[in-house]
Amino acid sequence: MDLEKEIQEIDFADINMAGLFGEGVNNAIEGLSQMAGREVKVVSMDIKKVLVKDIPDLFGGPEALIIAIYVEIFGKANANGHMVVVYKPEVAFGLVDLLLDQQNGSTTELNDMENSTLGEVGNIMGSFFLNYLSDTTGQRLKPSPPAVMMDMAGAVLDSTLANILAYSDETYIVDTVFGTKDRQVSGTFMIIPNPSLEAG
């Protein structure tokens, strides 16, 4: 896909960073193909730089229920950033059905199997995303074990957003639609680099 055509609402100075994260997310999603047992591709992608304080409103407000997969990014000595994938609950359930080859609508809640499936999504996407960033930036990066959370957006995002506000009032949001030939799901990636990761 032509990411330059998909990048919107980004200042020219941010194009390289947005393109880097966009390609990384594309790589991460296509990594799900091995889990699904069939090709998973990105259908559309919209990359934006947004104010951190506005992030909960992107998901329906602080009290809206979300499911998030959180991965911390480790580099040379300290944590180099964070990756958070956010879904509406019904979308996350649909992703579980897609990956487990179940009829759409089979999953209606997060039990051990569903939580484990989404955790594996975090493992695969985190690894593929960081492999791309490592190859591109020359930094050795590795993901933490993923954490899967289902709660109100404000509760889930508060601790993560506090980390961002320590050094920036803006961050990157990547809205994606992806899936197989017969099913599609949508999700939002938050790419939260600290200055050392942005510097490459």
Regions found by a protein language model. Give the residues of each.
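Composition-driven recognition of glycine/serine/threonine/acidic- and proline-rich low-complexity segments
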Residues: 2-200
